[in-house]
A protein has these predicted regions:
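Mid-domain alpha/beta scaffold segments of enzyme catalytic cores
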Residues: 1-173
Length: 173
């Protein structure tokens, strides 16, 4: 909701969708700039909340200094989750090992701060499941699969582990 193409009519749009009984929005960041924007929008509306993180494709730009800023932002009272985090192997511009390293670090941050995680999983199902299991995510925090393109049997396995699912873009293709 904080993206530039909403600038012209954002307030009108948000008023309208709230009148249509949308009770809450969790607006995720994909880097520092968008995480800060998500918080700014959440501060403006009592029914909008933010999630902060580095999106898988953006982790190639992430370093310890930027991670420290994400940790700082994550402690804001309107930040309710760490996300959108995960792995995206569809695009080849960020090495898998870089994505995996920062995925783990962001899971650990969520656990440390007691916040749920919002997961992006595109063409990386086995590695996402393995890392979530190895980090104890299902036992130590709540897990929301936001972008999910895996199989029905894997979805059932995730549900059995207590995972939540949102309706996201992949249902359209």
């Amino acid at each position: 909701m904080d993206q530039a193409h909403f600038d012209e009519d954002r307030d009108e749009l948000l008023t309208r969708i709230h009148e249509e009984n949308v009770s809450y929005i969790m607006n995720p960041g994909v880097d520092i700039e968008t995480s800060e924007a998500a918080i700014a929008l959440a501060e403006k509306y009592d029914w909008i909340y933010a999630a902060v993180a580095y999106y898988p494709q953006e982790t190639r730009f992430l370093d310890e200094e930027k991670f420290a800023r994400i940790k700082e932002l994550a402690q804001h009272p309107k930040v309710v989750a760490i996300g959108e985090i995960g792995l995206d192997y569809y695009w080849e511009d960020t090495p898998h090992d870089v994505q995996q390293y920062w995925f783990r670090r962001q899971i650990q941050l969520a656990i440390e701060l007691g916040k749920p995680i919002c997961i992006h999983d595109r063409e990386a199902h086995g590695d996402v499941m393995r890392i979530l299991d190895e980090e104890g995510a299902f036992e130590k925090t709540r897990v929301l699969m936001h972008c999910y393109s895996g199989s029905a049997p894997m979805a059932k396995e995730l549900l059995a582990k207590g995972c939540y699912f949102s309706i996201a873009g992949p249902v359209t293709y």
